[in-house]
Amino acid sequence: MKPSFKDEKALWEYIRPRLRGRMWSRVETICPDGMFDAHAFFGQSQIWLELKVGKPSIKALRPSQHSFLIELVRHDQPAWTCFGCRGEVLFFEGLDFDTAVVPPFYRPSIARS
């Protein structure tokens, strides 16, 4: 049976046990051009992950999220957008919203206990 994603919290609860690796941060911050890296935004210590429910599209991002995603890509940081759409989990890397991929940190199936 396919999962149902009524909101971003439901999507997060579904994917969280399937994620492995580094610290996760949402793409919610704006880092103005020229701002020093005071909060280690670009330190390779975390994977930036934004969650959305609905049809995959760059238009799903708020303008501040889109701007920050551009900065992450510009600084060669791992940044992904995950969409929960019609019972499927779709990941898009960086600014490429045309091709869904399975990232190395995601295990689509988890062992049942």
Residue positions per predicted region:
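Helix-rich interaction surfaces within compact, conserved domain-sized segments
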Residues: 96-113
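Nucleic-acid nuclease catalytic cores
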Residues: 73-99
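Acidic-basic catalytic patches of nuclease active cores, encompassing PD-(D/E)XK
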Residues: 1-29
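Active-site-adjacent loop/helix micro-motif of nuclease/hydrolase catalytic cores
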Residues: 55-66
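A conditional alpha-helix N-cap/helix-loop micro-motif detector
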Residues: 28-31, 61-62
